[in-house]
Amino acid sequence: MAFLKKSLFLVLFLGLVPLFLCENEKREGENEKEENDDQSEEKRSLGSFMKGVGKGLATVGKIVADQFGKLLEAGQG
């Protein structure tokens, strides 16, 4: 009877260890996927931010050029 208990314990142990290892690998894979998703989102946010900054600088440059042109016209007249 003790032999059967030991055998059953061994079978359960050998069955649970690989299951535990697979669950850990699955969690690690999910964590890596989440990190990649977060990095992609940060890159998209940074791209949108840079696009907005570029548009803002273009607008400011246009305003400065217009004002500078007006000053030159006023100085010549």
Curated annotation (Swiss-Prot):
Cleaved signal peptide residues: 1-22
Pfam families: FSAP_sig_propep (PF03032)
Secreted is among the record's keywords: yes
GO cellular component: extracellular region
Tissue expression per record: Expressed by the skin glands.
Residues bearing the modification Glutamine amide: 76
InterPro entries: Frog_antimicrobial_propeptide, FSAP
Propeptide stretches in the record: 23-42
Keywords: Amidation, Amphibian defense peptide, Antibiotic, Antimicrobial, Cleavage on pair of basic residues, Secreted, Signal
Domain of life assignment: Eukaryota
Keyword Ligase tagged: no
Protein localization: Secreted
Family statement: Belongs to the frog skin active peptide (FSAP) family. Dermatoxin subfamily.
Biological role: Possesses a potent antimicrobial activity against Gram-positive and Gram-negative bacteria. Probably acts by disturbing membrane functions with its amphipathic structure.
Protein name from the UniProt record: Dermatoxin-A1
Organism annotation: Agalychnis annae (Blue-sided leaf frog)
